[in-house]
Amino acid sequence: MAPVGSRESLAAAIQAGADSIYFGIENLNMRARSANTFTIDDLREIARTCDEHGMKSYLTVNTIIYDKDIPLMHTIVDAAKEAGISAVIAADVAVMNYARQIGQEVHLSTQLNISNAEALKFYAQFADVVVLARELNLEQVAEIYRQIQEEHICGPSGEQIRIEMFCHGALCMAVSGKCYLSLHEMNHSANRGACMQVCRRSYTVRDKETDVELDIDNEYIMSPKDLKTIHFMNKMLDAGVRVFKIEGRARGPEYVRTVVECYKEAIKAYLEGTFTDEKIAAWDERLKTVFNRGFWDGYYLGQRLGEWTRNYGSAATERKIYVGKGIKYFSNIGVSEFLVEAAEVSVGDKLLITGPTTGALFMTCLLYTSDAADDLIGV
């Protein structure tokens, strides 16, 4: 499941062959501040685009819902139903209940922190797909999957519940993303989609009694590394995970395309019996080229304490530099015209071209000539 926070990322998800995408509109989603691109008027277009490419479309309505939000929530869920959105992703029972009332499919968010089969049985009345708590290890996931099969725990469709888990991307320092630090420090609630990323800053630790600053080995003491599971995708599949969710609605289209392609290839390799160390190493190198804060395994393999990044921002092995913008595309000959206005281009440079219909295209500069009258780049 690919994260989509812009039309460029939607096009990139299509290019990468994603089976589904998830996105938010305006308010009432957990990326309302950082990925606020789409509106309620875009729902039909997004649903139609996904249908044309054989993808499912999932709309996040996963914030805390207050009484004053109920009319807006009804409007959004009604619009999703009318537009043909595949499902809404919910964390509040008010959203789940209303969606079921009008016949809109529901998926359950990790914000619910579902950690056992008994809780799953309760929520099964609302949804066929459930994101389990991200703090679970794979043994715990496998136990829940075993009970789903043995006790035939089904959702509204009558089919057995499918387990969805995050496989890649940023992790919140708080349990299942329920963070109050941003609200406390900046008066912007992460649980209302307005996280100010306070945890990503560097900090000093000082003893209040002695005023002595403690010597710590990492000043980014609340900023987790990014999750990466591609090297043990086989174990996740064996544990019963059936939907793999990639975090990153606020990240660029090149991130979406690269990460989706790598994980799709990994799942295919597992199914074909060609999931090898050599392929894992190649996927790792590709994943390092796009935005990341360093990587760790999350809690899936039994680790109980998080691993913290040592960088502010991205630790990607490749750095993007804005060079110029597209001017015109000549569709009859497949040639694009670009205005190079911000940086020089050299033969051998890796070029990234993005756009609402372009998605993310990676090319290499094979020819570059420049004179007073004209610049010509060949790729």
PLM features: residue spans?
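N-terminal basic/disordered segments at the start of proteins
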Residues: 1-20
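A structural micro-motif recognizing beta-strand termini
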Residues: 5, 331, 337-344, 356
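Active-site beta->alpha loop and helix N-cap motifs at the rims of alpha/beta catalytic domains
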Residues: 9, 39-100, 105-110
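Conserved, mostly hydrophobic/aromatic
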Residues: 13, 92, 123, 165, ...
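Catalytic alpha/beta core domains of metabolic enzymes, predominantly
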Residues: 107-242, 256-259
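Anionic-ligand-binding alpha/beta catalytic cores of soluble enzymes and soluble regulatory domains
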Residues: 140-143, 249-321
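Conserved small/polar residues in nucleotide/adenosyl-binding loops
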Residues: 368-375
